[in-house]
Regions:
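An N-terminal assembly and electron-transfer interface module characteristic of large anaerobic redox
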Residues: 1-417
Length: 417
């Protein structure tokens, strides 16, 4: 399928759209979905001093990710690089009953306090939250975003599963960058965005990564679960991927497509209207692509959790499917999936005070390991005032504990040590 070519000139668009950094492995591709006559996207990449800036304008009781997002956006506006009169801020919102539901209002208040009350805040959601402030989107945007998500998923899995074993340092990163450039060219030109080409590219990507020369050793694998921002953004998880690899282990982060399918399953398809019918069709398409991606990974002996519906079924009786706020039952289900499929060490990270993660995650982990009879789940919080030393020590405890001791949460593991 061919869609309209992207114009990358900032002056072509009516507005400059600040997009919060949330998905390290996906935004290099998904960002192309935002280009249009209306918007020129700028994905926030500033890191220096963002926590301090964010806490000037956001109450410490709010989620840690919000302080990072606000800090990045205020610093970008203060930098003088952008025409403030053309800037708009994007804040994706799930619209659930958690602190994240207040992100849009909190961001507006922060901008007002920072002297940028004139800068509009747009929301991107499917729940009808603040319809007057909804970002405009069309079919080419959705189509590009879908391709960016699935290509980002498979490249993330391949990179994380290859880099710890590469004989020539940097080989996996170079190959990842090569494929990002290839897909980026197609995204910009609006060509090769068909399911047939995606099917072929999945296998070419797996083949290329499988050809990288590897060390013979087999490393232990740590599964990462938790809140969306903390799981997929290095700012949110304090560079946990880099830390785990430096400790001689391999990390596995479950693809974003599981969250997309979970969200459609729990929030969109249960209504009886035209939007729900469209969501069901889109969900069928996502399921088909996800199965194809997993087949490609398995063909080249790369680990993956089962396709969404099988993955959900395997967690039956262990998680409560009625917990649908935020990441909801998906958090516990990912931990179950990892342990059932041989990844018996799971690291759970979440913002401090995240009630969804405490109810559907931390409060559930001890019962999961008892019922499964194996595995260990270590849970820790990220926060502006939290200790990174404590965070990394918990992770080290998980990495270094003997596999024969595995069956319980971190408190039970400490007792055995």
């Amino acid at each position: 399928m061919r869609v309209k070519r992207i114009n990358e000139d900032m002056n072509y668009a009516d507005s400059i759209l600040f997009v919060p950094a949330m998905l390290d492995m996906h935004f290099p591709l998904i960002r192309y979905a935002f280009y249009s006559k209306d918007y020129y996207p700028v994905v926030m990449d500033e890191e220096d001093g963002i926590t301090e800036t964010g806490l000037k304008y956001i109450n410490h009781d709010m989620c840690y990710p919000l302080s990072q997002i606000v800090g990045q956006m205020v610093n970008a506006l203060n930098s003088g690089k952008y025409d403030v009169n053309r800037v708009k801020l994007l804040m994706p919102a799930a619209g659930d009953a958690c602190r994240g539901a207040n992100y849009v209002g909190a961001l507006r208040r922060a901008m007002q306090d920072a002297g940028y009350g004139c800068v509009p805040v747009l929301t991107l959601n499917v729940r009808g939250v603040e319809p007057e402030s909804m970002m405009k989107f069309d079919f080419p945007m959705v189509w590009r975003a879908m391709f960016g998500m699935f290509y980002g998923d498979i490249l993330m899995v391949l990179l994380h599963a290859t880099r710890p074993y590469e004989k020539k340092k940097g080989a996996a990163d170079r190959l990842w960058n090569k494929w990002i450039k290839i897909i980026s060219r197609d995204m910009i030109a609006g060509k090769n965005l068909s399911l047939l080409v995606m099917h072929r590219n999945f296998r070419l990507m797996c083949r290329d990564f499988a050809r990288i020369r590897r060390k013979g050793e087999r490393k232990q694998v740590i599964g990462l679960v938790g809140e969306l921002y903390v799981k997929y953004c290095h700012l949110g998880n304090w560079d946990v991927v880099d830390f785990i690899e430096k400790q001689g282990a391999e990390i596995h982060v479950n693809p974003l497509s599981y969250y997309a399918l979970y969200y459609m399953d729990t929030h969109m398809i249960r209504k009886h209207n035209l939007e729900a019918k469209g969501a069901r069709l889109l969900m069928k398409l996502f399921e088909m692509i996800q199965k194809d991606m997993i087949k490609a990974l398995e063909k080249y002996d790369y680990f993956s959790l089962p396709p969404y519906w099988q993955f959900k079924k395997e967690a039956h009786g262990l998680v409560n499917y009625n917990v649908r706020n935020g990441d909801g039952w998906l958090i516990g289900a990912e931990a179950v999936g990892y342990i059932k499929h041989g990844v018996e060490k799971v690291f759970a990270a979440q913002p401090f005070g995240c009630m969804v993660n405490h109810c559907a995650g931390r409060g559930l982990y001890p019962s999961l390991t008892r019922k499964l009879g194996k595995g260990s789940i270590v849970s820790t919080d990220v926060d502006a005032s939290a200790s990174k030393l404590n965070y990394y020590n918990r992770l080290l405890m998980l990495i270094q504990v003997d596999s024969s001791m595995l069956c319980g949460n971190e408190d039970e593991v400490k007792e055995r040590e």
